[in-house]
Amino acid sequence: MKNAIISYNNSNNLGDYIQSIAAKNFFKKEPILIDRESLVNYNYKKVKIIMNGWFMEKPENWPPSEKIIPLFISFHINPTAEKKILTKKGINYLRKFEPIGCRDNYTKKLLNKVNIKAYFTGCLTLTLNKKKYINKSIKNDILIISVFERLLPSSINYEINFKLILNLIKIPFKYFLYKKGMRNILKNISSNRNVKHISQIIKKKESINQKYILAENQLKEIANSNLVITSRIHSALPAIAFGVPVVFLNDGLDHINHFSRIDGLNLFFKSINSSELSNIDIKKIIPKKNHLDFSNLMSEKIKNFINK
């Protein structure tokens, strides 16, 4: 039986591709890519798939095809999708593959409430191996990745309605919070430290292959840094896997869609508001190692699944 991983035809977030790379690294041969939103439509020979990541944009497409044999590990259900995923049919599907390995405690508790056996695994990106991404030509001191991007107004292309009006009202306030957060960062970084800014969001249209290349490049940037400051979990967690010190800034993550994703994952890194930066000495931040038991457990379960 062939192996597969989750892929993303329309995502502009490198974090999605970084999660897929973490899954792909377990296979000797190139796995099949199946789009997360089209799992229900798969109608070829049976495949084994590592079912990890954020689910999903189109929950009406749940559950997946019967020709897909999943290992649920590092699995997250978005709060806005939970009602459509956890229908009677969806619950019965998940029960066939329990226990479900959950990326966060929010998903674990959600599944436990409907009598699905579930446990916390953390994120599959914790299994990434630094050796693969060492690059002597990259020497970052402080790497700042996508801090406070959710506080910046995004391009709006939907018709005017009440929600749009509310968003337009919020834009000046969100931009003020963004500028305030950035000032807090710069104020607390010594002028003799070299700082590099990169984004986890892809700004222009790229092919799927190019997106994976960009994700690999971002992992190299993280692996060859002395410190990572970010508001993105899939920049923070690879840094933890690589033994790179991390400061996770949680400004703008108050909505349930955001804080549900970090429930439990914040055990692995220092999570603070930018206003608290003056209370810590970033030179003394030591990377935690409490992820190792979770990383080893996920690796063992995946290897057993592949070799079955």
Predicted segments, located by residue:
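Active-site anion-handling motifs in enzyme catalytic cores
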Residues: M1-K308
